[in-house]
């Protein structure tokens, strides 16, 4: 049997564990372990208590920064106040409706997924500690109940109040606003007639076989912050959408700024029409070049160099023309990239038509009617209808003979007086040509916002996993507001920490700020002690995290 034995060496008392046994019939001991002095034993005992039994590491930086930003803007409070009745707000799983939607926004920004998968993701983050909820309780039913409590007619007012606060806090001076539309395909069954928003139409992702919803968005050109959005039926045209969206959105923006004459809305040719432009003021738009061939022929030979504030020099022509019954400023802008792409596309179409004509031959074994259909199909490629022409004859035996020729002058006209040219129209006569061009180019900020909203790694408006119009409206509100939070966070990262990179790169960097849950032995009965500790990080990441408030308080 083992026992504890004390012994001395050079006047110092030591302890060891020994075991008795008999050797050759005589009692003896063997040493099992040398324990050292009393101080050594006590120190080792205390170290054993302080060594964690378990270490759990979770991502903390991104969720902490977004949660702090949402708190600063009072996102949850604004939602709750908009839907409260008699100062009572629906609470599920210890969260109000606004708090649940904020959690959904943070999840949408960091790791887009279905509401059913939210709990599994939340367990890997510091979000449950930040918002004081139990992750397993936030099921898809939880989000369904909370989203159902938010009426569609309150969304615009909530968004406006939130944007007003952003403008105040960031001291924004709104000037040029970019407007654009896109669509998102859904997987809502055709037999489901309950929702009216999903409809079949031309889909920009090529999924014409699926029902889609449309999204109109206005962003600030300087900051790319979304200022207003509207969800609409998937089959509605861009022109009709613009006409219906314009009046309420301009009123909202006037209320936000108080100086409507300073606001200029920029939109592309898809929303331009005579009816839309007739009632417009303070705008820059593009119109379809095919409707202004004489103008292009005149301007193509008079393009002048225009230096932009970015240091780039472009070629453009400026004049005045009648647009929607009023005299407007017109700028014809040449884009080398557009010219190169259009010319390459034409050359590919010509090469394809030549191959098909060679396969067809001059004496095809077809009837005259069949030959005509085939030739018309070949001429259907872009621009070929004006370049290629043909004649069909039949001989005495009824055999078909065809003759095909091309219009070289038309080819030259397309290459020199049409390709690469954009026509811009504005009522901002006091602006310089460079200002008009830069305002139009700023319309790409709305397109960039749509790219982010379709990014499967963040925001990802689709797939929606919702099947009613009300849920689709609230889901889109969550996605757009998440985009607002991340864009604002990115703006602050650039300003406060000199961050260089995309919004996705910023979230990835902040996600690397991790928090450890250390479960310690206490040496006593009862629950083990749990403490939080931030993992070590490089100085650049720490600087970024501290600037954005992405390091959680552990007290």
Question: Model segments located where?
Answer:
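Anion-binding and metal-coordination hotspots
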Residues: 3-16, 24-28, 83-555
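Conserved glycine(s) in the ABC-transporter nucleotide-binding domain "signature"
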Residues: 1-99
């Amino acid at each position: 049997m083992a026992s504890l034995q004390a012994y001395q060496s050079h006047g110092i008392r030591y302890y060891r564990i020994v075991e008795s046994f008999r050797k050759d019939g005589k009692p003896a001991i063997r040493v099992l372990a040398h324990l050292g002095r009393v101080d050594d034993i006590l120190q080792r005992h205390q170290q054993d208590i302080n060594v964690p039994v378990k270490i759990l590491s979770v991502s903390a930086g991104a969720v902490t920064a977004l949660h702090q930003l949402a708190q600063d803007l009072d996102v949850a409070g604004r939602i709750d106040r908009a839907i409260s009745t008699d100062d009572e707000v629906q609470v599920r799983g210890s969260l109000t409706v606004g708090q649940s939607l904020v959690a959904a926004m943070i999840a949408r920004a960091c790791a887009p997924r279905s509401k059913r998968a939210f709990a599994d993701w939340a367990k890997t983050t510091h979000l449950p500690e930040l918002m004081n909820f139990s992750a397993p309780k936030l099921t898809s039913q939880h989000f369904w109940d909370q989203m159902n409590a938010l009426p569609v007619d309150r969304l615009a007012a909530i968004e406006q109040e939130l944007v007003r606060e952003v403008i105040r806090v960031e001291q924004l001076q709104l000037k040029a606003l970019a407007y654009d539309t896109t669509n998102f395909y859904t997987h809502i069954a055709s037999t489901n007639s309950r929702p009216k928003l999903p409809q079949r139409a031309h889909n920009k992702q090529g999924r014409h076989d699926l029902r889609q919803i449309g999204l109109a968005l206005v962003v600030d050109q300087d900051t790319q912050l979304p200022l207003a959005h509207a969800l609409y039926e998937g089959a509605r045209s861009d022109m009709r959408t613009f006409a219906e969206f314009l009046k309420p959105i301009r009123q909202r923006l006037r209320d936000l700024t108080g100086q409507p004459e300073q606001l200029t809305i920029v939109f592309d040719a898809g929303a331009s029409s005579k009816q839309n432009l007739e009632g417009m003021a303070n705008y820059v738009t593009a119109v379809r070049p095919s409707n202004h061939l004489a103008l292009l022929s005149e301007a193509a030979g008079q393009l002048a160099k225009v230096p932009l504030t970015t240091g780039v020099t472009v070629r453009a022509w400026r004049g005045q023309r009648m647009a929607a019954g009023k005299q407007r400023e017109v700028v014809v802008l040449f884009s080398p990239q557009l010219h190169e792409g259009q010319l390459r596309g034409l050359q590919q179409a010509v090469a394809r038509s030549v191959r098909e004509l060679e396969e067809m031959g001059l004496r095809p074994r077809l009837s005259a009617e069949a030959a005509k259909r085939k030739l018309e199909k070949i001429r259907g490629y872009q621009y070929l209808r004006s370049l290629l022409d043909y004649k069909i004859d039949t001989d005495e035996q009824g055999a078909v003979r065809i003759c095909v020729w091309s219009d070289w002058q038309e080819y030259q006209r397309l290459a020199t007086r049409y390709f690469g040219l954009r026509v811009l129209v504005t009522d901002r006569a006091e602006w310089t040509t460079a200002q008009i061009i830069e305002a139009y180019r700023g319309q790409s900020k709305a397109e960039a916002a749509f790219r982010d909203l379709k990014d499967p790694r963040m925001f990802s408006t689709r797939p929606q996993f919702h099947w009613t119009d009300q849920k689709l409206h609230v889901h889109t509100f969550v996605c757009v507001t998440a985009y607002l939070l991340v864009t604002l966070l990115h703006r602050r990262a650039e300003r406060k920490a000199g961050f260089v990179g995309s919004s996705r790169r910023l979230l990835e960097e902040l996600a690397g700020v991790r928090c450890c849950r250390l479960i310690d032995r206490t040496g006593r009965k009862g629950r083990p002690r749990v403490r939080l500790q931030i993992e070590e990080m490089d100085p650049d990441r720490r600087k970024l995290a501290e600037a954005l408030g992405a390091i959680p308080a552990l007290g």
